[in-house]
């Protein structure tokens, strides 16, 4: 579909969407295209009505797709039709009659201080083994900076400024932000960099990325996910064991220790404050616990 190719190019060049997001949009639009073709024998995007789209949404829900995933697919299709209107391919937008299913708000899961202490106590970082130092620093990096998985993978050596005690991160839509680090964290990074240099020299490798896999190459998402999951599962029975739980932990820890929510928003790279405000719910729950301890008979 020519229109789709132009749309994906538009997302990449003008909107600066990440490759991960574009691949997701491609998958969602292909799924929709196959649905209307198989169900209604429609291949021309100009012939699609809002009734076809509603039917697709219903089929997704009936097949057990969770509302959050359905909303993502609707967002992809909504963006596509906005593009088609903008480029004059269609003159009516059927998405205007489509409502996204409501999502029950869930508080972000995080690890409390005791679990974080146990997490790092369980990990070995005393020796001179590169892989151990790397794995330890990966989890520590997520926890101390709140970066996303994709941001950590794309981090390069020059992005970590130990002189100025800051990390430069390129986030969604190529938005650049700086995250401060402590002197204590600087020392952990220096130890890692020393082992990293020896490790790459032994492999005769020259990798510009800050973290590498076991072969000295750029890491990939599943590689990092496995490292994080393997260690987090040692301290929690919760369902969430992904790198994102450490991002949630970073934000919650900052807020619980008095950080301004607008500052947390900037550190996380959120575009809107509403995305950051979800962490205030966790703080309220903590305040309730403190209150009960102070006034047990209240």
Language-model features and meaning:
Residues 1-298:
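Conserved catalytic core of the tyrosine transesterase superfamily
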């Amino acid at each position: 579909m020519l229109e789709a190719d132009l749309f994906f190019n538009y997302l990449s060049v003008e909107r600066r969407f990440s490759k991960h997001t574009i691949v997701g949009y491609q998958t969602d639009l292909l799924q929709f295209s196959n649905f209307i073709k198989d169900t209604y024998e429609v291949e021309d995007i100009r012939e699609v009505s809002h009734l076809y789209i509603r039917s697709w949404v219903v089929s997704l829900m009936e097949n057990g797709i969770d509302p959050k995933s359905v909303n993502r697919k609707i967002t992809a299709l909504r963006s596509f039709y906005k593009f088609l209107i903008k480029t004059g391919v269609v003159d009516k937008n059927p998405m205007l009659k489509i409502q996204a299913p409501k999502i029950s708000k869930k508080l972000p899961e995080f690890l409390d201080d005791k679990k974080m202490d146990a997490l790092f106590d369980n990990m070995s970082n005393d020796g001179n083994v590169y892989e151990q130092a790397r794995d330890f620093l990966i989890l520590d990096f997520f926890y101390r900076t709140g970066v996303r998985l994709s941001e950590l993978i794309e981090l390069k050596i020059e992005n970590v400024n130990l002189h100025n005690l800051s990390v430069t991160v390129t986030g969604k839509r190529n938005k650049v932000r700086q995250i401060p680090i402590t002197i204590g964290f600087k020392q952990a990074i220096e130890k890692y960099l020393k082992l990293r240099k020896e490790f790459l020299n032994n492999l005769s490798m020259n990798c510009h990325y800050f973290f590498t896999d076991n072969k000295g190459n750029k890491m990939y998402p599943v590689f990092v996910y496995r490292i994080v999951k393997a260690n987090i599962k040692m301290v929690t029975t919760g369902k969430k064991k992904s790198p994102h739980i450490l991002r949630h932990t970073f934000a919650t820890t900052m807020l619980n220790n008095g950080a301004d929510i607008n500052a947390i928003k900037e550190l996380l790279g959120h575009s809107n404050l509403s995305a950051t405000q979800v962490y205030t719910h966790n703080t309220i729950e903590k305040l309730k616990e403190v209150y009960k301890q102070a006034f047990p008979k209240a």
